From Swiss-Prot:
Homodimer. The modification Phosphoserine is found at residues 246, 326. The lineage of its organism: Eukaryota, Metazoa, Chordata, Craniata, Vertebrata. Enzyme activity is enhanced by acetylation. NAD(+) binds at residues 31-37, 57, 117, 140-142, 251. It is found in: Mitochondrion matrix. Acetylation is enhanced after treatment either with trichostin A (TCA) or with nicotinamide (NAM) with the appearance of tri- and tetraacetylations. Glucose also increases acetylation. Glycans are attached at residue 33. This is Malate dehydrogenase, mitochondrial. PROSITE patterns: MDH (PS00068). Its EC number is 1.1.1.37. GO terms for cellular component: cytoplasm; membrane; mitochondrial matrix; mitochondrion. It comes from Rattus norvegicus. One of its GO terms (molecular function) is L-malate dehydrogenase (NAD+) activity.
Length: 338
């Protein structure tokens, strides 16, 4: 009975994550044994888009890989343990996803993670620059507002920087905005799309409710409350987990969604749009998240901010100083590395 139930669910999951024909994407997850890494690896293993899944961490990866390898989907899974095995994990990869790092605990901001996670991201991206310089790099490790500039500076140091292939995964902000708007309006969240621009921390998270499809209207007080909830949704989860972690399952879902969109676009699917924190000329910040048209070579076209309301304009103006500081902090970290 259970197996009869499980198969349609598995098929539905696969369909929900991709509409493309089968492909042969080689994907690596760095930080695969962690709270985000394990469920993210499960979702990637479940996708017909992925033919090879290589998992890296400093502990437990052989076990995670063995467990996932028993799942009856086509992706071949292999685990790699410790720095000496990292080069083999990365060779030949098309996409590298990096959720590695320490999670937030109650009372911590994403920025409090900087010192630990900056070193981890710099080390891992240096290996990517050496062993898979052409791969798409998707950074989940917080603070994304600083870890993307770190990644870019590391790739520049190695002479292989391509701004169209480095993405800060902010998809969870869009997923949350879609969910919260759908809850308030009684809509199917799968049919709601709210662009979220800016960055990926606190007030730098700017949901453009005015651009939501389908169109929705909220009184100003409700709009302010909704915006605040989207901005602080990560903290909501950290508090609810009471010291036992941060948003891992929803982040894994959002990370998988972004990877599948990217792979679909790399396969030639047209009209694939996702928001992501990338190098940008849309504002005075050198990095900024906006809707992006994805293509075979990564970022095909930045679709920009579009028409916005005075309320949204004000949020952008207030976010820019914080974003600039976070970006500079990341860039300075790499410049000062020994």
């Amino acid at each position: 009975m259970l197996s009869a139930l499980a198969r349609p669910v598995g098929a539905a999951l696969r369909r929900s994550f991709s509409t493309s024909a089968q492909n042969n994407a080689k994907v690596a997850v760095l930080g695969a044994s962690g709270g985000i890494g394990q469920p993210l690896s499960l979702l990637l293993k479940n996708s017909p888009l992925v033919s090879r899944l290589t998992l890296y961490d400093i502990a437990h990866t052989p076990g995670v890989a063995a467990d996932l390898s028993h799942i009856e989907t086509r992706a071949n899974v292999k685990g790699y343990l410790g720095p000496e095995q990292l080069p083999d994990c990365l060779k030949g990869c098309d996409v590298v996803v990096i959720p590695a790092g320490v999670p937030r605990k109650p009372g911590m901001t994403r920025d409090d993670l900087f010192n630990t996670n900056a070193t981890i991201v710099a080390t891992l991206t240096a290996a990517c620059a050496q062993h898979c310089p052409e791969a798409m790099i998707c950074i989940i490790s917080n603070p994304v507002n600083s870890t993307i500039p770190i990644t870019a500076e590391v790739f520049k140091k190695h002479g292989v920087y391509n701004p169209n292939k480095i993405f800060g995964v902010t998809t969870l902000d869009i997923v949350r905005a879609n969910t919260f708007v759908a809850e308030l309006k009684g809509l199917d969240p799968a049919r709601v799309n709210v662009p979220v621009i800016g960055g990926h921390a606190g007030k730098t998270i700017i949901p453009l409710i005015s651009q939501c499809t389908p169109k929705v209207d909220f009184p100003q007080d409700q709009l302010a409350t909704l915006t605040g909830r989207i901005q602080e949704a990560g903290t909501e989860v950290v508090k609810a987990k009471a010291g036992a972690g941060s948003a891992t399952l929803s982040m894994a879902y959002a990370g998988a969604r972004f990877v599948f969109s990217l792979v679909d676009a790399m396969n030639g699917k047209e009209g694939v749009i996702e928001c992501s924190f990338v190098q940008s000329k849309e504002t005075e910040c050198t990095y900024f998240s906006t809707p992006l048209l994805l293509g075979k070579k990564g970022l095909e076209k930045n679709l920009g901010i579009g028409k916005i309301t005075p309320f949204e304009e004000k949020m952008i103006a207030e976010a820019i100083p914080e974003l600039k500081a976070s970006i500079k902090k990341g860039e300075d970290f790499v410049k000062n590395m020994k």
